[in-house]
């Protein structure tokens, strides 16, 4: 083992009491060591050409020294440190720390007992794989333990894209692979890098953030108890009801008057030690909860010393103290959990306000609350929040809304049965909803499991040996005449003993969150209800803090927690905007964006694409004359801003019926197989976009630009057409603009590739659908504007990207039967999205290997940081090694977080020098002090100008940094990239590689098809199947994107 750490996948760290040789002993573990590893001639056409007298724009780029013309003739894991021994693996041992949460003693053993450290298994040496080949497709990997990340030859230095069988002299196979090396399972040896310092570039300002300082005593203890309930309640709400009743009955007696906070599951935190180590209680609930008696067992489990938390916040200890922070967070949530509706980390109540958003739903208002460790200390992040709930209306009224029937009309004819489509729509909308009936003279609540396939008039059941209909039963028993007898009936209970509930006697119970996908009307209503300008939002947050009145909260006071009622104020900086370069043929060759936005007036694209073969198909009700005018204006706009766009379509522009989309597209492809661009005017109703994109991109190989009928399209709005032209240019392989100066002065001299990655998950209630992972990578150095995308399906809700790197076992060569019989000599084909993109970069950049790799990873929550670092960084390293064992580029891995609740507000509202037009902080505002992590490398960056509402800064957190960026370098790199987004002339809120990955993943969801048979077996190093201890569920393979489509930014 080498004696220095930090060179491997996971650099070695030094514990507070650590040794230096990678095997250090002591209560704080050791310091790990070791290295880880002119137009072409136009065809004669009968239809008119599209263009204007001064059209044409710039032609293709000329040869060196040529002149650019205009018009139609233009030329142009180490061991854990909890008191154990650290052993370096790959990159060495990790930081050692003393445990902060101590285990509770057994009932007969006085005093606390420390949690024992579990050692990791010894490392398996890296070995070489005898057969390496590139994979041309990005597909999900099978669930098997991944082989090691070594490779035999340099694929980058050989024929890229061709599968290679590596043999050792005389045609004999190379030495066999050894058994797979285990993925590291300990997180103690894995830690994000420390902050390299604070940024200094930019104009210094002061901002406020919706964080409130929390103070706790340095020497207090919080005691942890395990809670078990028998029989287990079905919901957390009942758990809390049981524990509230226990507190009411026994707080002053058996609990010794000590306050506690309950997490709604199995953890109970107390402000002092309870008079017992273990005790059972019997709690019986009232009639509303069916008078069930619960046995509650409370058993001491451990304690948290707040001293360790203070040491961590002060930067003197690396252990994150997450258990202690979680305990304090539960304490602060105890009172609102008993009084409000809980949705994740937010609390909602009608007392905060409600607003109708249409079609049977309403928006409830509330607040979000989360405790976080920051540089200024513990911080309570509070933000106003809104979410949709079911309106407490009759089920009949809801069904009318659901089916799009105005509530002031008579609605569907009760005498007419619902169509199969309507019945399925209602079934999906009402499944799992709790309803209340009052026809029995009392209130009864039921949970809907399904709706019947038969109408109410055909439902029979047996009672007292006789068979009667539901209609007869209600008439005789309740004197109630049912009207909607042709509609289906709600069904509750289980299939063997169903309970039939006519819709007209049921009302939806208040307080149920709607978690399914909203329609366009509801989305608009929700945005209207929640969108608030910065000054108003800040005031609402302060009012919410005052309403919560934390000093008067007995539980908070008993735990000796003090919360400031003033927003945190902190220094910030406004980074300078980059200068953009456009083509020299334009009147303006450079552009200095002001407040994050600019336009294309007097500018020409720096790399205008050439589109010779195109056409347009209209699926809407637009008149064909309007379609011709649109095409003419669009061609003119493209030529005017720098493209070379043929005025004559390849085949005549025409219209087709929306119900004949596949046939129409196929006919176009047959007539024009070399089509470069297809302009599609979408049908007037929604639902066709995905079908068009799937057929064009995976079946026909057509790059398409869809246009939605509307006012801007019909009026031929100039700004609209310019934005469409920007998208068309990059889809055709062009480049809109580039940065005038290097991305980072002094920071990216070497060849660099920038990746973006994201995973999108199916909508709530659609868990049978796969999650889609997408990885994009820049293909042009040094401009860094063109990104190639690959996509892959993986198991539902799986956040770890499984297909970054894969190794697929292949059959043994027939010339080596003995090796095959031995069972240990295996050949593999290496693949995966990361590897394929690296190879594409190599082939497109004069066979230059990137020396720096920057990986922006979107969609990862705080709790997934170590998991992503363990598996995805491992996959990245293996993919690099599989190309060339001697190839060791420097990798930086940055998590991009947009779904957080931190908001930045200007020091003084209304001052033009401090805000943009919307009243938000100016683009380029960066914060890396008070509200950021105590010791790790992170920052908040507001890179865009607000349009409406309050801008949300993006949080960037560095998980791995071999490039050793300074704070200024990474912040400027990220901010400058935000000005290179291809689809608009604005800086964007998220760094473009991550933005593109999100677009690509979202696009790929349209590709989902029925299962396809596939006998290949592959294993992925980027997945967490090993951690899960079993095989992930099978997923449908995505259809392959055609090569000509995949090579351009088709997802824009």
Curated annotation (Swiss-Prot):
GO terms for biological process: regulatory ncRNA-mediated gene silencing. The keyword Transmembrane helix does not apply. This is Protein argonaute 14. Keywords: RNA-mediated gene silencing. Pfam families: ArgoL1, ArgoL2, ArgoMid, ArgoN, PAZ, Piwi. SMART domains: DUF1785, PAZ, Piwi. The lineage of its organism: Eukaryota, Viridiplantae, Streptophyta, Embryophyta, Tracheophyta. Residues 40-49, 97-117 have a biased composition (Low complexity). The gene is AGO14. Residues 1-39, 50-59, 66-81 have a biased composition (Gly residues). Probably involved in the RNA silencing pathway. May bind to short RNAs such as microRNAs (miRNAs) or short interfering RNAs (siRNAs), and represses the translation of mRNAs which are complementary to them. Belongs to the argonaute family. Ago subfamily. Residues 394-510 form the PAZ domain. InterPro entries: ArgoL1 (IPR014811), ArgoL2 (IPR032472), Argonaute_Mid_dom (IPR032473), Argonaute_N (IPR032474), PAZ_dom (IPR003100), PAZ_dom_sf (IPR036085), Piwi (IPR003165), Piwi_ago-like (IPR045246). Residues 173-183 have a biased composition (Pro residues). It comes from the Eukaryota.
């Amino acid at each position: 083992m080498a004696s220095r750490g930090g060179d491997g996948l996971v650099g070695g760290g030094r514990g507070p009491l650590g040794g230096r040789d990678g095997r250090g002993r002591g209560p704080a573990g050791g310091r790990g060591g070791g290295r880880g590893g002119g137009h072409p001639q136009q065809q004669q056409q009968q239809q008119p050409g599209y263009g204007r007298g001064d059209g044409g724009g710039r032609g293709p780029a000329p040869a060196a020294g040529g002149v650019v013309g205009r018009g139609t003739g233009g030329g142009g894991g180490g061991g854990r440190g909890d008191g154990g021994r650290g052993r370096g693996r790959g990159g060495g041992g990790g930081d050692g720390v003393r445990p902060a949460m101590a285990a509770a003693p057994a009932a007969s053993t006085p005093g606390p007992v420390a949690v024992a450290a579990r050692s990791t298994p010894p490392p398996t040496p890296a070995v070489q794989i005898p057969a390496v080949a590139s994979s041309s497709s990005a597909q999900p990997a099978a669930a098997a333990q991944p082989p090691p990340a070594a490779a035999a030859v340099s694929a980058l230095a050989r024929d890229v894209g061709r599968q290679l069988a590596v043999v050792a002299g005389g045609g004999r196979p190379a030495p066999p692979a050894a058994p797979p090396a285990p993925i590291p399972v300990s997180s103690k040896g894995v830690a994000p890098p420390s902050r390299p310092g604070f940024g200094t570039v930019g104009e210094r300002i002061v901002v406020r953030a919706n964080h409130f300082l929390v103070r706790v005593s340095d020497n207090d203890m919080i005691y942890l108890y395990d809670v078990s309930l028998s029989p287990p309640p079905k919901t957390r709400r009942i758990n809390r009801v049981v524990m509230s009743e226990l507190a009411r009955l026994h707080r002053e007696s058996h609990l010794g008057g000590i306050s506690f906070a309950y997490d709604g599951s199995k953890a109970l935190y107390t402000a002092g030690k309870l008079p017992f180590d273990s005790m059972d209680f019997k709690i019986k609930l009232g009639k509303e909860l069916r008078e069930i008696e619960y046995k509650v067992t409370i058993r001491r489990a451990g304690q948290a010393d707040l001293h360790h938390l203070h040491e961590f916040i002060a930067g003197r200890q690396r252990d994150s103290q997450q258990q202690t922070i979680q305990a304090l967070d539960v304490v602060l949530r105890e009172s609102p959990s008993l009084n409000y509706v809980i949705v994740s980390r937010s609390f909602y109540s009608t007392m905060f306000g409600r607003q109708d958003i249409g079609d049977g739903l309403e928006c409830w208002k509330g607040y979000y609350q989360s405790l976080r460790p920051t540089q200024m200390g513990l911080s309570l992040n509070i933000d106003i929040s809104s979410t949709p709930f079911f309106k407490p209306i009759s089920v009949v009224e809801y069904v009318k809304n659901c089916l799009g029937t105005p509530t002031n009309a008579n609605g569907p004819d009760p005498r007419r049965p619902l169509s199969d489509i309507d019945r399925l729509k209602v079934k999906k909308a009402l499944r799992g909803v709790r309803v209340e009936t009052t026809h029995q003279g009392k209130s009864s609540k039921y949970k809907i499991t399904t709706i019947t396939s038969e109408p109410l008039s055909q439902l029979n059941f047996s009672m007292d040996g006789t068979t009667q209909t539901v209609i007869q039963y209600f008439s005789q028993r309740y004197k109630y005449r049912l009207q909607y007898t042709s509609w289906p009936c709600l069904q509750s209970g289980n299939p063997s003993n169903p309970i039939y509930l006519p819709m007209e006697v049921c009302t939806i119970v208040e307080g149920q969150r709607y978690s399914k996908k909203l329609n366009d009307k509801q989305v608009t209503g929700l945005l209207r209800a929640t969108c608030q300008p910065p000054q108003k939002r800040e005031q609402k947050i302060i009012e919410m803090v005052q309403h919560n009145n934390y000093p008067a909260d007995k539980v908070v006071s008993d735990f000796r927690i003090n919360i400031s009622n003033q927003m945190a104020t902190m220094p910030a900086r406004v980074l300078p905007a980059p200068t953009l370069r456009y083509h020299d043929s334009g009147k303006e060759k450079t552009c200095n964006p002001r407040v994050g936005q600019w336009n294309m007036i007097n500018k020409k694209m720096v790399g205008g694409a050439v589109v010779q073969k195109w056409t347009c198909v209209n699926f809407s009700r637009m008149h064909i004359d309007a379609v011709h005018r649109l095409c003419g204006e669009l061609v003119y706009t493209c030529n005017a801003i720098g493209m070379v766009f043929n005025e004559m379509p390849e085949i005549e522009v025409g219209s087709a019926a929306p119900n004949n989309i596949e046939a129409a597209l196929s006919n176009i492809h047959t007539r024009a197989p070399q089509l470069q661009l297809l302009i599609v005017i979408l049908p007037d109703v929604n639902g066709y976009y995905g079908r068009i994109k799937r057929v064009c991109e995976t079946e026909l190989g057509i790059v398409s630009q869809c246009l939605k009928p509307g006012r801007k399209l019909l009026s031929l709005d100039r700004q609209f057409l310019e934005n469409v032209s920007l998208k068309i240019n990059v889809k055709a392989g062009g480049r809109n603009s580039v940065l005038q100066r290097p991305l980072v002065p002094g920071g990216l001299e070497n060849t660099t590739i920038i990746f973006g990655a994201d995973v999108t998950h199916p909508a709530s209630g659609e868990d049978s659908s796969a999650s889609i992972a997408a990885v994009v990578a820049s293909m042009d150095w040094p401009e860094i504007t063109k990104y190639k995308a690959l996509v892959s399906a993986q198991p539902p809700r799986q956040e770890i990207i499984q297909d970054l790197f894969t190794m697929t076992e292949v059959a043994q060569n027939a010339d080596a039967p003995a090796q095959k019989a031995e069972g240990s000599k295996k050949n593999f084909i290496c693949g995966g999205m990361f590897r394929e993109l690296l190879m594409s970069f190599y082939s497109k950049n004069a066979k230059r290997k990137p020396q720096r790799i920057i990986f922006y990873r979107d969609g990862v929550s705080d709790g997934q940081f170590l998991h992503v670092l363990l598996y995805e960084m491992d996959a990245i390293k293996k993919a690099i090694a599989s190309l060339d064992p001697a190839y060791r580029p420097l990798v930086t891995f940055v998590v991009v977080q947009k779904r957080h609740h931190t908001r930045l507000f200007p020091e003084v509202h209304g001052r033009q020098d401090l805000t943009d037009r919307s009243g938000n902080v100016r683009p380029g505002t960066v914060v890396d002090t008070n509200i950021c992590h105590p010791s790790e490398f992170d920052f908040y960056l507001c890179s865009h100008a607000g349009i409406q509402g309050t801008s949300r800064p993006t949080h960037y957190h560095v998980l791995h940094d071999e490039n050793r960026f300074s704070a200024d370098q990474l912040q400027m790199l990220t901010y400058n990239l935000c000005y290179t987004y291809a689809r608009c002339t604005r800086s964007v809120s998220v760094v473009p590689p991550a933005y593109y990955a999100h677009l690509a993943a979202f696009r790929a969801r349209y590709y989902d098809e029925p299962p396809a048979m596939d006998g290949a077996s592959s294993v992925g190093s980027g997945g967490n199947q090993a951690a899960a201890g079993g095989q992930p569920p099978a997923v449908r393979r995505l259809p392959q994107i055609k090569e000509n489509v995949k090579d351009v930014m088709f997802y824009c």
